[in-house]
Amino acid sequence: MKSFKKVAIIIFTLTFGLSIFSCKENKSTMLNQNKPLIFYNRQPSDPVTGKLDFSAVSWNSRTYYLGTDSQNGGETQGQMILDFLQNSNGEEIDRNGDGIIGYVLLIGDEGHTDSKARTEGVRKALDTWNNSTKPNIKKEGTVNVGGKTYKTVELAAKSMTGADGSTWNAAAARESMKIWTNSFGKSIDLVISNNDEMALACIASENFPKGLPVFGFDANASVEKAITSGLMTGTVTQNTDSQALALLFLVRNMCDGFLDSAVYTQGFSHGDKYGNKISTPFVYYNDSRSLLVSNTAINKDNWNEYMQNAHNSQISKVQSSRVKLLLSVYNSNNDFLNQNFIPSINYYAPLLNIDVTIIYGDGQNESSCLSKFTNLDYYDAYAINLVKTNNAHLYTNKLNEK
């Protein structure tokens, strides 16, 4: 997101007009191509270069991308690791006493915006960044551990792709960690993963060294025991509950007829007419039509603060007309979406009077979602979680059909 112009969400906004195409007023006549469309979690982009697919996010005036600030996420994970090292005893971290902090890096998906940002953030923090997120392009660096300078070496990095072609694959992570443990032994001082699921797979791998610091990303419910017991050192929350609420607010606002900046400020920077307001700050990037939430580092000391009673109890029931939303989930086995995001969607949707129909994919083939992306006239809005980030046009093409 570096090149995109940032537009801060401010308390007061000048535009509060109603659209003549509000969902409420035109359910029977509105063309699907004019309805609200939100891409979320997986930004439409080139999977190789990461370049934004602007034609997708600007498909109509009611199209947006909702997600986390990827760059901030990578920086947050990197800083979390630095903070841990600076407050640790170097002799305890450097397991073989060679003066080198060696680490292995589990990459989720080389072409995914979030994965690339996390890889970059970690390498920059550990001074191994060599202007690339590719697995084998890095350099040696230095880092402060407990007041002493140590050399840093990325012993191995690998994109975790399963035999079936699925990315962010836990089975691949488990097998890779087993191989690395056998190959590098006590040279491994840290395990760093682009997500929690792969981090947990490493901990469960054969002969995994007890007490080895492990860092993940997502703060899934499945890592609670690992975090609170110290098996896992740290993770990063994408403030998922707020993301889910934000998606529903975007839908609600557009279907209630709000235009322009009112779409992403009503309920965000200020409360709606019921006093409902998201507690987490969001930033809107005008050049990419993206609404992004910041990230927070999590360890055993602050897990309860961020994860217990995660739902916003201040959100009250609205009296607006009922809205029907079709929402896709790219992978029915994805922990982040199924443990965190979807439960929040299911919690808030009734409060905002939104009926949500969820379709699930297999994480590999776009057709697994696209084949269920049907009966489109029935719905007032759509939320798409792409299987492949360069396939947004397949959905907009269907919405364009007469």
Model-derived segments and spans:
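Hinge/cleft segment of the Venus flytrap/periplasmic-binding protein
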Residues: 97-102, 106-110, 114, 126, ...
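Bacterial N-terminal signal peptides that target proteins for export
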Residues: 1-8
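C-terminal motif of bacterial Sec signal peptides marking the signal peptidase cleavage site
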Residues: 19-22
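Short, solvent-exposed amphipathic alpha-helices that sit
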Residues: 73-77, 114-153, 172, 176, ...
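Hydrophobic alpha-helical segments within soluble ligand-binding/sensing domains
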Residues: 58, 64-98, 117, 170-174, ...
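Hydrophobic alpha-helical
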Residues: 27-33, 37, 122, 144-225, ...
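Flexible loop/hinge segments that line or gate small-molecule binding clefts
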Residues: 26, 30-72, 91-102, 220-228, ...
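Extracytoplasmic "Venus flytrap"
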Residues: 28-29, 107-116, 190-196, 323-344, ...
